[in-house]
Curated annotation (Swiss-Prot):
Residues 565-567 are annotated as: Required for palmitoylation and association with membranes. Homotetramer. Homooligomer. Can heterooligomerize with MCOLN2 or MCOLN3; heteromeric assemblies have different channel properties as compared to the respective homooligomers and may be tissue-specific. Interacts with PDCD6. Interacts with TMEM163. Interacts with LAPTM4B. Residues 1-65, 322-350, 406-427, 514-580 are cytoplasmic. This is Mucolipin-1. One of its GO terms (molecular function) is NAADP-sensitive calcium-release channel activity. Disulfide bonds join 166-192, 253-284. A motif (Selectivity filter) lies at residues 469-474. The chain crosses the membrane at residues 66-86, 299-321, 351-371, 383-405, 428-448, 492-513. Residues 87-298, 372-382, 449-456, 478-491 are extracellular. The most N-terminal extracellular/lumenal domain (referred to as I-II linker or polycystin-mucolipin domain) contributes to a structure with a four-fold rotational symmetry in a tetrameric assembly; the structure contains a central highly electronegative pore with a 14 A diameter. The pore is critical for Ca(2+) and pH regulation. The protruding structure formed by the I-II linkers may contain all the interaction sites with lipids and proteins in the endolysosomal lumen. GO terms for cellular component: cell projection; Golgi apparatus; intracellular vesicle; late endosome; late endosome membrane; lysosomal membrane; lysosome; membrane. Widely expressed, with the highest expression in brain, liver and kidney. The modification Phosphoserine is found at residues 10, 557, 559.
Length: 580
């Protein structure tokens, strides 16, 4: 019989010994593993990473998701083509009207002279201003297009008039270059003259129009050149785009907001002249087109696209969810049965990046299609936003086709090479970006005043990127050669700058970049080569030797993996290079 002291010592030892019953996992031994349970988990994991063809052989389930993606590619591409044809007509109509306005309202304008079109004398400036207003007043008689005035379209300074002629100048300004003195009050004053087109009776000659309704008041304009900032002419015109009849669509009504600017903020003796337009598209009030087609087919087709993408979204989202559930089951199983934690990278293997790509494309397609329906109903006019949404979604849909090519060894070279080379390429690009940005800032601050290609940071980046690809080398050097007489020091610096950049990036950076890609290709081109070691998850799955045609995958339908097409990965004996 044990003594009380012995019993107390035994109880103390038992309490101080780690035990699962006291809420701690330290020192716990994994629960015994049932061979059947573990084999069933391996089999479900292997099925989850099978290709659609292997899943069909394993359970006889048709790859419905694959067939749905093929249908989605067709309908999305057809939709994009139809919208592209319509959008092309809109952009063409807008650009051609802008060109027509420049020829109508800018005195002496010629195509391609936007950057050099300017006034250099006071007489030229007055003539250009009066010419633009005169052309506006007689526009219905001279233009080839059908335009209508917009009463009250002169902007906030028009006071309800159709056209506003405004000059902006400093409140007080006195400049005396002879004595190197100036006196400027930087407050800006805006003076405007309102002009309305006359309501011409039928029997009045056009040359007498200037004297009706006081429209000739703009002729009394007096510019304060010594303190002038700019002169602006703002008005609106309406027209109808009949080109849409080509695509069997109802024409749209357009309102062009036109702004002519005579810019003198530099006070350099040169006043650039530019014309800018903004377009507003709205539905015509009482459209009447004989024998025009019905747009119900386009609406029905858009609805089909939305339904197809919605179904694709649901199936892909369900597959992602089932992958997440299977991952949790695997993590819990490995901890309870083997006492091992699963790393983050192994968990991410359950996340199919291709499904995320397809889900993103579905969201963009649905958003773009809804916007397209609004545009065709004349409730929206965001053609550019709709184009970006539909174009990006179509790009992602077609890129998603590569996933199904990765199920074949010979078609998987591109994806496998990118997968192996991507980490090294990203690190390499980070180092190169530092040098590239340094050249951008240096070129902008030093060469910007002397070279048109270095006037802004974005232009510098575009110029240097073109030089890397071997484009416009001679033109870039020649433009700096013309500036040699202005500053020999800057010209010498430009030679060192350009030669060092071209030599560094073409002969070294590009060569190393290509070497990284080539090295990755050499790694994976050998049979069985993947460029990376197999993870513990892959090694665990490979212990399942059941082939898809063994019939064992048909047992137990309560699988946590997708019922249709999941992320494809061939069996290990095939030695295929599959990227998920």
């Amino acid at each position: 019989m044990a003594t009380p002291a012995g019993r107390r010592a035994s109880e103390t030892e038992r309490l101080l010994t780690p035990n699962p019953g006291y809420g701690t996992q330290v020192g716990t031994s994994p629960a015994p593993t049932t061979p059947t349970e573990e084999e069933d988990l391996r089999r479900r994991l292997k099925y989850f990473f099978m290709s659609p063809c292997d899943k069909f052989r394993a359970k006889g389930r048709k790859p419905c998701k694959l067939m749905l993606q093929v249908v989605k590619i067709l309908v999305v591409t057809v939709q994009l083509i139809l919208f592209g044809l319509s959008n092309q007509l809109v952009v063409t109509f807008r650009e051609e009207n802008t060109i027509a306005f420049r020829h109508l309202f800018l005195l002496g304008y010629s195509d391609g002279s936007d950057d050099t079109f300017a006034a250099y004398t006071q007489e030229q400036l007055y003539q250009a201003i009066f010419y633009a207003v005169d052309q506006y007043l007689i526009l219905p008689e001279i233009s080839l297009g059908r335009y209508a005035y917009v009463r009250g379209g002169g902007g906030p300074w028009a006071n309800g008039s159709a056209l506003a002629l405004c000059q902006r100048y400093y409140h007080r300004g006195h400049v005396d270059p002879a004595n190197d003195t100036f006196d400027i009050d930087p407050r800006v004053v805006t003076d405007c003259i309102q002009v309305d087109p006359p309501d011409r009776p039928p029997d009045i000659p056009s040359e007498d129009l200037d004297f009706l309704d006081g429209s000739a008041s703009y002729k009394n304009l007096t510019l304060k050149f010594h303190k002038l900032i700019n002169v602006t002419i703002h008005f609106q015109l309406k027209t109808i785009n009949l080109q849409s009849l080509i695509n069997n669509e109802i024409p749209d009504c357009y309102t062009f907001s036109i702004l002519i600017t005579f810019d003198n903020k530099a006070h350099s003796g040169r006043i650039p002249i530019r014309l800018e337009t903004k377009t507003h598209i709205q539905e015509c009030k009482h459209p009447s087109v004989s024998r025009h087609g019905d747009n119900s087919f386009r609406l029905l087709f858009d609805v089909v696209v939305i339904l197809t993408c919605s179904l694709s979204f649901l199936l892909c989202a369900r597959s992602l969810l089932r992958g997440f559930l299977l991952q949790n089951e695997f993590v819990v199983f490995m901890w309870r049965r083997r006492g091992r934690e699963i790393s983050l990278w192994e968990r991410l293997e359950f996340v199919n990046g291709w499904y995320i790509l397809l889900v993103t494309s579905d969201v963009l397609t649905i958003s773009g299609t809804v916007m397209k329906i609004g545009i065709e109903a004349k409730n929206l006019a965001s053609y550019d936003v709709c184009s970006i949404l539909l174009g990006t979604s179509t790009l992602l849909v077609w890129v998603g086709v590569i996933r199904y090519l990765t199920f074949f060894h010979k078609y998987n070279i591109l994806i496998a090479t990118l997968r192996v080379a991507l980490p090294s390429v990203m690190r390499f690009c980070c180092c190169v970006a530092v040098i590239y940005l340094g050249y951008c800032f240096c070129g902008w601050i030093v060469l910007g005043p002397y070279h048109v290609k270095f006037r802004s940071l974005s232009m510098v980046s575009e110029c240097l990127f073109s030089l890397i690809n071997g484009d416009d080398m001679f033109v870039t050097f020649a433009a700096m050669q013309a500036q040699q007489g202005h500053s020999s020091l800057v010209w010498l610096f430009s030679q060192l700058y350009l030669y060092s950049f071209i030599s560094l990036f073409i002969y070294m950076v590009l060569s190393l970049f290509i070497a990284l890609i080539t090295g990755a290709y050499d790694t994976i081109k050998h049979p069985g080569g993947t460029g990376t070691e197999k993870s513990e998850l892959q090694a665990y799955i490979e212990q399942c030797q059941d082939s898809p045609t063994s019939g064992k995958f048909r047992r137990g339908s309560g699988s946590a993996c997708s019922l249709f097409c999941c992320c494809g990965r061939d069996s290990p004996e095939d030695h295929s290079l599959l990227v998920n």
